């Protein structure tokens, strides 16, 4: 057996908007009018009954349960799948000034077994691209200019391979 890999993956973005505006956007997470999750390019985040403490859902093969829900501050999820992901991911809002808010996405987990390999060689790169796309979507909601983070070659290759795999199903 391999030793668990400790993962701390943090993305932050400063958005030139009051915290209340971003809290309103965070409250749309997984809803049809979602202002944050980039479901235009990635598997949608889905929860049958919406996001509330105890709700089960996820995106693609990644599954989690809502542990904390206060869209004015934090939404925290605990991983339930894939096997070997032991930990949480969360979105947090922090007021910097009256018109400037920091949004942070954090994964804090330990991986074990096959999940360690999958995190290192595939999921991490896809996750990083997805979160930056989500932050772009949020920022673009309030901007005249369109921000679009560029995917690196590895993300493009992984997405191409996954698209082929899905097409065969």
Question: Across the structure, where does each feature detected by a protein language model lie?
Answer:
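Beta-strand/loop substructures that line and gate deep hydrophobic ligand-binding cavities in soluble
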Residues: 81-140, 149-151, 155
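Short, conserved beta-turn/loop elements at beta-strand boundaries and strand-helix junctions
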Residues: 70-75, 98
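Short, exposed beta-strand/loop patches in secreted or surface proteins that constitute
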Residues: 42-46, 64-68, 94
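Hydrophobic ligand-binding cavity/cleft-lining segments
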Residues: 1-47, 163-169
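Hydrophobic pocket/interface hotspot
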Residues: 21-32, 66, 75-77, 103-105, ...
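Short beta-strand segments that buttress and anchor functional surface loops
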Residues: 50-58, 76-82
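Charge-rich (especially acidic), low-complexity segments
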Residues: 148-169
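Short, surface-exposed coil-to-beta transition loops
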Residues: 8-10, 59-64, 85-90
């Amino acid at each position: 057996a391999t030793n668990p890999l400790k993962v701390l993956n943090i993305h932050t973005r400063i958005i030139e908007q009051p915290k209340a505006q971003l809290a309103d956007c965070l409250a749309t997470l997984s809803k049809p009018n979602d202002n944050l999750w980039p479901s235009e390019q990635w598997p949608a985040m889905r929860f049958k009954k919406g996001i509330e403490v105890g709700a089960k859902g996820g995106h693609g093969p990644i599954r989690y349960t809502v542990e904390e829900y206060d869209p004015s501050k934090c939404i925290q999820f605990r991983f339930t799948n894939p096997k070997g992901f032991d930990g949480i991911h969360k979105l947090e809002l922090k007021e910097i000034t009256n018109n400037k808010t920091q949004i942070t996405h954090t994964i804090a987990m330990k991986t074990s077994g096959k999940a360690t390999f999958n995190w290192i060689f595939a999921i991490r790169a896809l996750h990083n691209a997805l979160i930056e796309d989500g932050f772009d979507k949020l920022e673009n909601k309030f901007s005249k200019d369109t921000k679009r983070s560029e995917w690196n070659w590895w993300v493009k290759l992984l997405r191409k391979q996954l698209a082929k795999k899905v097409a065969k199903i």
